[in-house]
Amino acid sequence: MLDGGTVERNCRVPANVALLVPLINNVWLSTPGDPAYGLYPGDSRLAGYARELRSHVACVRPARVLSLRIDGRAVAGLDRFGENLAFFAAQVPSGGVLGSDQALLTPNVDSGYYAIFRPLPSGSHRLHRIAEDGFGHRQDVTYRLRVG
C-alpha cells in the first residue's frame, strides 16, 4: 500500500446521491504472473493461496487511527464500518492496471473501512478523514464537496 499523505480534493456531487467513502483500505489485484491468477472464489485450488492473499491486505484491520468529520461533526463508531477480506473479480479496460490488455483480474482481495451515508443537503460541505493502518501508513484527506 502506498502512503497517502495529506491531500485536499474539490468534488461536485449530484443532489440526492448517497456517498460511499473509503476511510482506509488495502487491495490486492492479481495479475497474470501470480500463481493464483484466474482462480475464482469457490475454486478448490484457491484455498492454498487464500492465506497468502489475505496477508497482503490484513494490515488495515484493526486501524490505529480512524476519524471522519462531516462539516466539523465527528462520526462515531467507525470501527463498525469494517469490511474484512472480501474476494472479488475486477474487469479492467485495455491500458488499465499495469498497462494490461483488457482482462478480468481474479482473485482479488480487499480489506478496509468504508462509510456510507445518506445524501447531503445541497450546498457546500467539508468531509475530513484521517486514518492509519497497522503498518503506520497514514492518510489525511479533506474533501470540499459541492452538492447539487
Where are these regions (language model features)?
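Extracellular-facing segments of soluble proteins and assemblies that are Gly/Ser/Thr-biased and enriched
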Residues: L2-Q91
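Extended, well-structured beta-strand/loop surface patches
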Residues: R61-S124, I130-G148
